[in-house]
Amino acid sequence: MGKRKANHTISGMNAASAQGQGAGYNEEFANENLTPAERQNNKKRKKNQ
């Protein structure tokens, strides 16, 4: 089927549908101001995607 687009590069509305409910939309905007604990969690999540 040709090359697949990497899901994590998509921003905006498409991110939620590509990554599953809650993954795209919530985490895109959570990056603005994270607590240290959230930042730790965010790094782990990004590696897994």
From Swiss-Prot:
Residues 8-20 have a biased composition (Polar residues). GO terms for cellular component: endospore-forming forespore. Signal peptide: none annotated. Keywords: Sporulation. Residues 1-49 are annotated as: Disordered. InterPro entries: SASP_SspO (IPR012613). GO terms for biological process: asexual sporulation; sporulation resulting in formation of a cellular spore. It is found in: Spore core. Pfam families: SspO. It comes from the Bacteria. Induction: Expressed only in the forespore compartment of sporulating cells. Its main location: other. Belongs to the SspO family. This is Small, acid-soluble spore protein O. It comes from Bacillus anthracis. The lineage of its organism: Bacteria, Bacillati, Bacillota, Bacilli, Bacillales.
